[in-house]
């Protein structure tokens, strides 16, 4: 809801107030404790996957290189929001500077965009490995996989420059309270002193094209993969392929299910509380679940993690490669 015209000439805002989760002090402390534990577990889970891939030579393959990149991304994805949210639980003001808000906006959504590209790259890797096994070693070399990973990072951090720039140029001169725990484009545009239909349309088109194009690419890849797997005569071969692809599909379902509800469905018009819960799910809970999904459904990753935990015990430290 735009502010009245008579307030349009007020001083521009220098900071925003993130309402977060308004509740009693006791509940705030409880939430702080819960999210602090979730954050630490997320860091530990994704770091374990990175270390397992790094220290096991037999995991230096395109699939696991992409997975290690994905885990590294998840660490920074959750770090872009949770530490600030934890600080706000213990703060009385819950303020964030104007520039700090847009920096968080840029990094959070850039990493979310990068995640869609990595999920697409991982789906393409599985398609080549299962549907084109004879061509896979020549097409998906380690060097090419590294270039694909670098492309995901560069494209992910380039795509959101335009939306961030357009929204940052809107005049903010009235209310500065954001009913959210992060700087989300929807609540930000609602605080603008003037209507900005062009910016809203551009952002909506951008979100829809990005989400649906990558989602269709991923689903098309896995549709072909499933068709190929069903033709495998060996039950053991089918089980191994489904175990690997099943973990990828579970991650895709968690992430895309929540962002579609958030950005390409009527949920955007629902109360702020629902938007917070959905955002919380894809920004905090999915990075926590992903290491569990990959480690529980992938035999090679389970073995690598077991080996990692074994050598980390006191008195048994040695190089994992030995």
Please identify what each model-predicted range represents:
Residues 1-322:
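Transmembrane helical core of 7TM receptor-like proteins
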């Amino acid at each position: 809801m735009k502010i009245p015209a008579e307030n349009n000439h007020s001083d521009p805002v220098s900071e925003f107030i993130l309402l977060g989760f308004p509740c009693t002090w006791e509940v705030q402390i409880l939430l702080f404790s819960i999210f602090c534990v979730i954050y630490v577990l997320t860091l530990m889970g994704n770091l374990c996957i990175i270390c397992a891939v790094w220290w096991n030579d037999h995991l230096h393959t395109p699939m696991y290189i992409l997975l290690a990149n994905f885990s590294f991304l998840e660490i920074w994805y959750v770090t872009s929001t949770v530490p600030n949210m934890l600080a706000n639980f213990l703060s009385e003001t819950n303020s964030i500077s104007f520039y700090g808000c847009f920096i968080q906006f840029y990094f959070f959504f850039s990493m979310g965009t990068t995640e869609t590209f990595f999920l697409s790259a991982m789906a393409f890797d599985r398609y080549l490995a299962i549907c084109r096994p004879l061509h896979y070693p020549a097409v998906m070399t380690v060097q090419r996989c590294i270039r694909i990973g670098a492309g995901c990072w560069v494209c992910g951090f380039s795509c959101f420059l335009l939306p961030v720039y357009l929204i940052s140029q809107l005049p903010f001169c009235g209310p500065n309270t954001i009913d959210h725990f992060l700087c989300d484009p929807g609540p930000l545009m609602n605080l603008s002193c003037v209507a900005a239909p062009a910016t809203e349309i551009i952002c909506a088109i951008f979100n829809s094209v990005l989400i649906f194009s990558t989602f269709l690419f991923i689903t098309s890849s896995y549709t072909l993969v499933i068709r190929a797997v069903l033709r495998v005569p060996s039950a053991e071969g089918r089980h191994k392929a489904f175990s690997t692809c099943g973990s990828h599909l579970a991650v895709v379902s968690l992430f895309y299910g929540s962002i579609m509800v958030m950005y390409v469905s009527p949920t955007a018009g629902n109360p702020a509380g629902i938007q917070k819960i959905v955002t919380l799910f894809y920004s905090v809970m999915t990075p926590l679940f992903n290491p569990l999904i990959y480690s529980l459904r992938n035999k090679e990753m389970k073995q690598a993690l077991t080996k990692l935990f074994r050598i980390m015990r006191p008195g048994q430290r040695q190089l994992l490669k030995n």
